[in-house]
Design a protein with these regions (language model features):
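A short secondary-structure junction signal
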Residues: 25, 63-66
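Acidic, Mg2+-coordinating catalytic module of metal-dependent nucleases/exonucleases
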Residues: 196-217
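Short, amphipathic alpha-helical segments
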Residues: 3-7, 11, 166, 170, ...
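Beta-propeller domains
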Residues: 58-60
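ATPase catalytic-site recognition across NTP-hydrolyzing enzymes
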Residues: 1-56
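Mg2+-dependent endonuclease catalytic cores in nucleic-acid-processing enzymes, primarily RNase H-like
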Residues: 20, 65-195, 216-220, 224-228, ...
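A residue-level signal for conserved active-site and pocket-lining positions in enzyme catalytic cores
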Residues: 9-13, 64, 104, 176, ...
């Protein structure tokens, strides 16, 4: 199709990483961000709260985006991922950063009580709050593939308002650029479901942001800071 042709063209003539990922969901949006110089050095605005957006992977991996709302812009200032660590580790990571936090957005599975902990089982969200990561806002998990695709569309929509710190968010940016549809080898077509790989967690945590915060606050809390800015100028 047209998108595949464009991807192959980018790959062949520009050695473009974005183009080389066939079926990448956010290729167009991330390429636009690069062209508009929105993947750059993004300073932390000290007087503005930092919101965090999480993905709690089933394979014990954890990803966190750190985002500020400044004017009409989402400033994606930091990113962290790890695996095999307990929540205390992530609470420590957050505390060691200089940020003043707003809410922490976690997917719905964070609200599920841990079965292994006996009668006094606490959910991961409750454990996080006990560790000082609070308040936690629970974001509904996509229940089916339609909801996943709606979340991908929400992420595409919000990417045009995002500025990424290219150093602190390098792994997260790579995850967004590499997040792609499964390729059906038998039929030689892209399937309608995302490939689960190393890019999934960063992309899922970003979807927590797009669905749990950006869509819900459009025209409300974020507009209190809104000011008119040209697309390629960062708010001060």
């Amino acid at each position: 199709g047209e998108e595949m042709g464009e991807a192959l063209f980018q790959q062949e003539y520009f050695c473009s990483f974005q183009g080389a990922v066939l079926g990448a969901y956010y290729a167009k949006q991330m390429l636009q961000a690069r062209r508009e110089n929105r993947i750059t050095q993004v300073p932390w605005a000290a007087g503005v709260e930092v919101y965090t957006f999480w993905d709690l992977g089933v394979d014990d991996s954890m990803t966190i985006w750190f985002i500020q709302v400044v004017g009409h812009q989402y400033r994606v200032i930091d990113y962290y991922e790890n695996s095999g660590m307990g929540l205390a580790h992530y609470a420590k990571v957050l505390k060691e950063k200089p940020y003043v936090y707003g809410d922490h957005y976690m997917p719905h599975d964070a609200a599920v009580r841990e079965m292994s902990s006996g009668e006094n089982a606490k959910s991961r969200a409750e454990v996080a709050e006990d560790l000082g990561v609070r308040p936690v806002q629970i974001v509904q998990r996509a229940r089916n593939m339609d909801a996943v695709m709606a979340g991908i569309e929400a992420s595409r929509n919000v990417l045009s308002q995002c500025w990424f710190d290219e150093t602190k968010c390098s792994k997260g940016i790579a995850a967004l650029e590499g997040y792609r549809a499964e390729y059906d080898d038998d039929k030689k077509i892209l399937s309608n479901r995302p490939l689960h790989d190393h890019c999934s967690h960063g992309a899922d945590a970003f979807r927590t942001f797009a669905v749990g915060y950006a869509e819900k606050t459009k025209g409300s809390s974020w507009s209190k800071l809104a000011r008119s800015l040209p697309k390629n100028a960062m708010a001060v």
